[in-house]
UniProtKB/Swiss-Prot annotation:
UniProt keywords, alphabetically: Cytoplasm, Isomerase, Porphyrin biosynthesis, Pyridoxal phosphate
Cofactor requirement: pyridoxal 5'-phosphate
The name this protein goes by in its record: Glutamate-1-semialdehyde 2,1-aminomutase
One cellular-component annotation, GO: cytoplasm
Organism, scientific name: Fusobacterium nucleatum subsp. nucleatum (strain ATCC 25586 / DSM 15643 / BCRC 10681 / CIP 101130 / JCM 8532 / KCTC 2640 / LMG 13131 / VPI 4355)
EC number(s) per entry: 5.4.3.8
Family designation: Belongs to the class-III pyridoxal-phosphate-dependent aminotransferase family. HemL subfamily.
NCBIfam families reported in the protein's UniProt record: hemL (TIGR00713), PRK00062.1 (NF000818)
Self-association and partners: Homodimer.
GO biological process: protoporphyrinogen IX biosynthetic process
GO molecular function: glutamate-1-semialdehyde 2,1-aminomutase activity; pyridoxal phosphate binding; transaminase activity
Alphabetical list of Pfam families matching this protein: Aminotran_3 (PF00202)
Cell location: Cytoplasm
PTM annotation (N6-(pyridoxal phosphate)lysine): residues: K266
Amino acid sequence: MVFKNSIDLYKKAVELIPGGVNSPVRAFKSVNREAPIFIKKGQGAKIWDEDDNEYIDYICSWGPLILGHNHPKVIEEVKKIIENGSSYGLPTKYEVDLAELIVDIVPSIEKVRLTTSGTEATMSAVRLARAYTQRNKILKFEGCYHGHSDALLVKSGSGLLTEGYQDSNGITDGVLKDTLTLPFGDIEKVKEILKNKDVACVIVEPIPANMGLIETHKEFLQGLGKVTEKTGTILIFDEVISGFRLALGGAQEFFGITPDLTTLGKIIGGGYPVGAFGGKKEIMDLVAPVGRVYHAGTLSGNPIASKAGFATISYLKENPNIYKELEEKTNYLIDNIEILAKKYSVNVCVNSMGSLFTIFFVDIDKVENLEDSLKSNTENFSIYFNTMLENGIVIPPSQFEAHFLSMAHTKKELNRTLEVIEMAFKKIGEKSGK
């Protein structure tokens, strides 16, 4: 493959944009690439770069494109909106339609407020929890990523792990002192922290996907529900990734556990910028202009994102078998990946839930938290990534992210993916002398 146009664009970009990208993981630095690939179009399960290289895509815009790229039902609806205008700074029926659909489907949400990003949604949900409880402290889990607001950018996952750190400069000690962190999955330590009844909220990814995918034990989430209820602490499920992907009603439907507040993003915008936070009416009615918890946004409830999200979720609702089909595709890949790993004596642990999975290059049986994830052999991951990319398969450029499948991925594309994974594992096995 030739990458000249992408390399030239990157050289230009680094003179104009910090690091040449608008989100750090996109720079491809952790996988030892000279430049990232610059994308010009997508269709179905495939994308094409500026050098006209074709790829089977397992990033899917980091999760929103559960139907695949450029799905006709979504594009058709978006075109209708664009013909009338892009944004008005005033309400439209489309945001009401989307809100009604979300409230109808997501178990915990009685009222919802739309935002323009997942970061904005989690930041606002934490503010709301503090106002409702009249407490300042919050509890999050190591390796879970909830966007880049100051209070939540502590022992975080996603791009921070990719860059080799877990916190950010520029966050004051005053902010940091109110953010408590614990290892994911340790309910006894949660009980110890919450017993003083001075923590406003516990925020958690019900399926962590930003330290690589972690397979959640239902008992841990049930434990969080019980201890937060007992201590008057707000339980926030960050379902920006899992919402409408693990099941139509998200992880809370999948596990049968109802939080107090939920944050959403990605799929609810159908590939356009969006976020949302919602929950119990008595809590949500503290949000301005009803209450004094302020949230606003020039593009909140944007008609294009609202209509794209409505079209996507409506399609999912009308075709409930999609979730079973996606899980079957994922399991087909995983079963064969594990066979190939044994064939070439490559140490891996493959975690999956629904249509998400991560191949951890580790010499342990199970990856269950950040400490386990950090044992990954990132050199082996780099070989895996580069072999895939150079043979027409694009995956997240980080050991600490999840692969995403869409309904557009075909058996033929899955089999081609396995052929290239075999190439990668063979290289890794030869390097290790096995």
